[in-house]
Amino acid sequence: MKKFICETKNLSKKYKDFYALKNVNLTIPKGEIYGLVGENGAGKTTLIRLLTGLNFKSEGEIILFGHTDNLQYERAKIGCTIEMPALYKDMTASQNLEVQRIQRGIPNKECIADTLELIGLSNAGKKRVANFSLGMKQRLALGVALLGEPEFLILDEPVNGLDPTGIIELRELLKKLVKEREVTILISSHILSELHQLATCYGFLHKGELLKQISAEELNEECKRHICLRTDNIQKTTLLLEQKGNINNYSVYPDNSIRIFECLDNVRMISKLLSSNGVIIDEISVQGENLETYFENLIGGRKNV
């Protein structure tokens, strides 16, 4: 049975007559990297602020580490970066972390050097944050979130300002945290191609509503290139595919479509096979999506809602 680090039940945030979030039912399993996908204004940051206690919910329930009571205590196990966190510009990276360590009552002074090494700022020396690049500031913000070895890490747009090398380093660091420290991560980003290389499960937000949750394996299966086939007789179609077309790598979906994952260059052969045996074809086309296209198609029917 899966253990959930974070859950919400019908969570809503309302401003007068406007719902920034509406009836969000979120589940984040332990040890996963949960990619939160959504357009600007979809409610990603609002959701994160509710989870971390920086804003109050209007309705619904938040469950952290299996508990609904004393959430302030449970939130002590969370490290987070929301938008661009406040850093002391006249201080060094080490001094910034030391201030945060003292404020949080973390006794282990050695965690400063360990954290600087982890985020790649151990050589920053006496350089003040005011002179940091945006990427260096992002890494320092991540270091602040990692102080105290949190069990649940929440990152809002963490790759902003990072160059390609920095993005790769961050990706490997987050994977390392999951593998070696068993940290669970919620990460929101508008760079969907990067999420696709990192997340193990996804939630899709649109206009404050959570449209869908899906595992990376399920998403990859749905995005995989295939022949989408719809006919007037599924049973007869599958028999013909197997017995006369020698096609066995296919799946039948609840919407009565058939996805064929082989013979992608032989659409004409499949069409001829079915038509010549009295099957009426309603649709036959080669399809396949990346994460951006998948999300666009997912929200396509909701844009005018």
Language-model segment annotations:
Residues 53, 219-222, 250-252:
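Short, flexible turn/loop "capping" segments at secondary-structure junctions
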Residues 103, 298-302:
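Phosphate/oxyanion-binding loops and surfaces in catalytic or ligand/nucleic-acid-binding neighborhoods
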Residues 1-12, 301-305:
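ABC-family P-loop ATPase nucleotide-binding domain
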Residues 73, 220-221, 241:
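Short loop/helix-cap segments at secondary-structure boundaries that form the rim of catalytic
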Residues 225-298:
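Short, charged/small-residue-rich alpha-helical element at the C-terminal edge
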Residues 209-232:
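Conserved beta-strand-loop-alpha-helix hinge in the C-terminal portion
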Residues 3-6, 13-187, 192-206, 210-212:
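ABC transporter nucleotide-binding domains
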